[in-house]
Each structure stands twice: as C-alpha cells, then as structure tokens.
C-alpha cells in the first residue's frame, strides 16, 4: 500500500456516517434510498460518502434495471478488506517516498 491509498482509505472511513454505511453494507447490499433511510442521512450526503468509499476501493456499485418504476436502481455493497496500521508502517511509507 502506498501513502496515497492509505490516505484515501483513512479519509473515507474517518467519519461516523461512513462507518455506519460500511456496517449496513457489510450486512447486505442496498440501493441508495434504502441506505439513506437506514443510515439516517440525506441522499446527497450519502452520495458524498459513497463516492469516497468507492474511490478508496471499500465499496462497489452496480446499476440494475427493473420492469416497474423506478426502472433503475444503483445498488452498493461492501468489499471485504483488512487494514493493519502501525507507526512503523507509516514511517516506512514515508521513508520509501523520500
């Protein structure tokens, strides 16, 4: 992992809403309206968090089409990951980039 990737992951997870989103998506995939309702935030705010989480590689999305309205829904699901962080790891990341 490089410094940029670690920063993206920590930035994406560095918020209570993002952690709640990850917990909900760890249980099951959700579409946006359903997820916003469960997390208790507006859809625009949810999209901001989802974008950060997706850019960090922590969630993925899929658009599905239906025969009845709404005809398309964007579903999100958590990607499995493990993060180990230590002071020595951070020191090594910085040293390798100098």
Task: Please give the residue ranges for each predicted region.
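Alpha-helical residues within the helix-turn-helix
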Residues: 37, 54-55
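Short helix-coil-helix linker/hinge
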Residues: 11-17
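Short, Lys/Arg-enriched N-terminal segment that forms or immediately precedes the first helix
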Residues: 1-10
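Beta-hairpin "wing" of winged helix-turn-helix
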Residues: 56-70
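Pre-recognition alpha-helix immediately N-terminal to the DNA-recognition helix
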Residues: 19-23
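Conserved segment of winged-helix/HTH DNA-binding domains
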Residues: 67-98
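Short capping segments at the starts of secondary-structure elements
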Residues: 16, 27-34
């Amino acid at each position: 992992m490089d410094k940029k990737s670690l920063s993206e992951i920590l930035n994406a997870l560095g918020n209570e809403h993002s952690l709640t989103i990850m917990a909900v998506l760890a249980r099951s995939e959700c579409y946006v309206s359903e997820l916003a309702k469960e997390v208790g935030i507006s859809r625009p705010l949810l999209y901001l968090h989802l974008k950060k989480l997706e850019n960090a590689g922590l969630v993925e999305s899929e658009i599905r089409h239906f025969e009845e309205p709404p005809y398309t829904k964007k579903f999100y699901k958590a990607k499995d990951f493990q993060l180990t962080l230590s002071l020595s790891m951070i020191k090594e990341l910085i040293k390798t980039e100098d």
